[in-house]
């Protein structure tokens, strides 16, 4: 098992949920967290615990973002006009690695980050190797021609457990996608419930 895969499953176990909807997730087999104390009976969470968990789950879903990365995105969501929770989701979904994942060019968000880092992705014809690059509406994201026969890509396009959302227009024959619009919370196909409202409450007190 690769370090990336191990980290992904550790996040699932820590959250006690299959947050990416993957059939091989360990929480499909057991309902307790990682480590020797994971099997202890779960206690009712405090409000703070629920808020922290909501933040950790959202951070984990987008590739286990660091607190510094996530806090910076949250601060921007708070600054711009509109609902902070909706803004937060929109900014996360506009990350280049998130769009590559949504387009089903790769099997996992962790693979998307590595794929972008290694220079396999073009945005409007220019190579971009920064996973956090902010995609705009109308941007065309494509896999470099030399990279299109990679096994991970061919596997990802056939994954049955997730579909391409309607705010990403993907053509798997050309390995090209257009970012149609910035989504809101209700548009994003999360396999589990995400609660940005609790994230707002967390940062309001910390």
Curated annotation (Swiss-Prot):
GO terms for cellular component: small ribosomal subunit. Residues 18-46 are annotated as: Disordered. GO terms for biological process: ribosomal small subunit biogenesis; translation. Coiled coil: none annotated. Residues 94-154 form the S4 RNA-binding domain. InterPro entries: Ribosomal_uS4 (IPR022801), Ribosomal_uS4_bac-type (IPR005709), Ribosomal_uS4_CS (IPR018079), Ribosomal_uS4_N (IPR001912), S4_RNA-bd (IPR002942), S4_RNA-bd_sf (IPR036986). Keywords: Ribonucleoprotein, Ribosomal protein, RNA-binding, rRNA-binding. The keyword Mitochondrion does not apply. GO terms for molecular function: rRNA binding; structural constituent of ribosome. Pfam families: Ribosomal_S4, S4. Part of the 30S ribosomal subunit. Contacts protein S5. The interaction surface between S4 and S5 is involved in control of translational fidelity. NCBIfam families: PRK05327.1, rpsD_bact. One of the primary rRNA binding proteins, it binds directly to 16S rRNA where it nucleates assembly of the body of the 30S subunit. HAMAP family: Ribosomal_uS4_B. PANTHER family: 30S 40S RIBOSOMAL PROTEIN (PTHR11831), SMALL RIBOSOMAL SUBUNIT PROTEIN US4M (PTHR11831:SF4). Belongs to the universal ribosomal protein uS4 family. This is Small ribosomal subunit protein uS4. It comes from Dinoroseobacter shibae (strain DSM 16493 / NCIMB 14021 / DFL 12).
